[in-house]
Amino acid sequence: MSPRSRSAPSAPPDSPTTAPTAAPGAPPGNRAAVPGPDGPDGAPPDRAPRRRPPSPGPGRRRVLVLAGSAGAAAALGPATGASPAAAPASGTRPQRRVPGGRAAVDAPHTGTTLTGVAAPSGDGPFRRLVTGPGWARVVRTELARAGARRAARAEPLASFVQFTDLHLVDVQHPLRYEYLRAQTASAWRPQESLSVAGAVSLVERVNALAGGPATGASLSCVVTTGDNTDNNSRAELEWFTTVLSGGRITPDTGDPRIHEGVQDCGLPDFWQPDSDLRDRDKAVGFPRLRGFLRAAGRQVAGPGLKLPWYATVGNHDALPGGCFAAADARGFFADFATGDRKLMRLPEEQGARLWRAVERGRDPGGRLFTELLRAERRHMRKVTPDPARAPVTPRDYIRALARPQALGPGPAGHGYTEENAVEGTLYYAFRIAPDVMGYSLDTTRRDGHYTGRVGAAQLSWLRRQLAAHRDRYALVFSHHTSTTTPEGGTELLALLRDTPHALAWINGHSHRNRISPHGTFWEVSTASHTDFPQLARTLELVDNRDGTLSLFTTLIESAAPHRTDFTDLSQTGLASLYRELAFNAPGARHGLAGAEGDRNTELLLRKP
């Protein structure tokens, strides 16, 4: 039976509807362009789809356009349009009635990239950011036509937010490989020490949204798609849960009186913000900022999300460095992570050899990395040991999300259940809206490597879930993309193509916006919140009541102002600086915002 049209609920979504069974040897993956980066057949779903009375007619709870046809076009996109090309949406914002009886005056475009986006100004190697023109909405019709009257008929089904690749990072962690900067710009980023302040500002932006930017419908939840943390570290995991659930965070480990990372090591290879040293970053315009490191490690106050949130695991959450085999509570990597030595510099030739091995998958277990660290011990800086830097196992990860302190707006476990913890699986199903199911997958490779994998057992579990909930639309979430999942990715694409009610595969990992049609569904990949342009995405599913559906995607930035002031080291000032440093990072990849058709879109689908 095809999914039925219903309006999105104003109440929070349910807890997971099913808990997967064992996932032996799940595997792990990457941190977008950096190193890094299933369980056995699960039990049947713990409950069958609930049967509800049929929808009482086509006019039921449909969106009512109160501001005229121009406003409708602005919110729902042009009535016609070919593939990624399309006329921009009008700036007029409509008033509309949304599920739950609450009228949304003006579809909430404010705070989205529809109205403005950070853009560089001026000349010189270090460019300041200002507010540039917004990105127009593009109507994409590769999978279905765009009916001329769809805006007037449209009925919202679901509205939620995607966070991906936050990379909350302990910049003093001993296992980090900043010394590979010459091989890959993602080994070290000058903005990294501000990741927590930046993520808190993103939460503030979501909390300020009045509803979905396209429909005005109430947002039901936030779903992360992995690389929530950077170093598979207990401290970073605590920061992540506190950022999303609310509380005070001190983004610092080791000795609170001193900074023991590469930004205070006296080497010209890295930006030394508090020093007069003429390092390679100051040579291209990076400022000298007295008090920067002290401010970066200062306590941050986070309001936490007002919405329920669900987590998906990425390779940096699961693997040391995002690319080496999962660490146990004991062993070399665990001991080194919590130990008193940190390597700051490596001859370029040695670094190149190690990086080639990582890229080519020759060192998934980290043998070469281990040998290197042992051989270079006498060249390392002595640092303050800290048990909070210990690696996190899958069970640690699940139980950390289930702690009372991590609850926030819920649900308990943020998708994961005690059964997941017992079985060691990191995939689950959850309800986004009455007629929309979400499926969070684990695409990491626990035996090492930053690329993705979907094992046979997990595919079998997903196939059963999709069959059990065939009367609801399906949205699949994972960290890795179809092009970065060499094992099981093709099979997953085939499964989704063969499932009429599967509408989208939503992911991250590549740190780049990209939206691709796959015959019957869309793949939506979203840029990270660590590399510029530092984005998240809202997604809104609409029934056009003409035999088609629309999936609206709208990019958002953090609430931090685009303009920065180098003298402002407040929490908000640091969040602004986080974005500007990312734009100017030497060697950073440009073009991560993607093309117009990868940003703010209306994606048409045939209704199954």
Language-model segments: which ranges?
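Metal-dependent catalytic neighborhoods of phosphoester/phosphodiester hydrolases
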Residues: 225-245, 320-331, 485-487, 514-519
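N-terminal secretory signal peptides
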Residues: 1-58
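Active-site-adjacent structural elements in enzyme catalytic domains
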Residues: 156, 224-247, 251-254, 298, ...
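Sec-exported extracytoplasmic/periplasmic mature domains
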Residues: 207-211, 241-249, 467, 497
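Active-site-proximal segments of metal-dependent phosphoesterases and phosphodiesterases across multiple
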Residues: 445-507
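Active-site glycine-centered loops adjacent to acidic/histidine catalytic or metal-binding residues
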Residues: 165, 226-227, 314-315, 479, ...
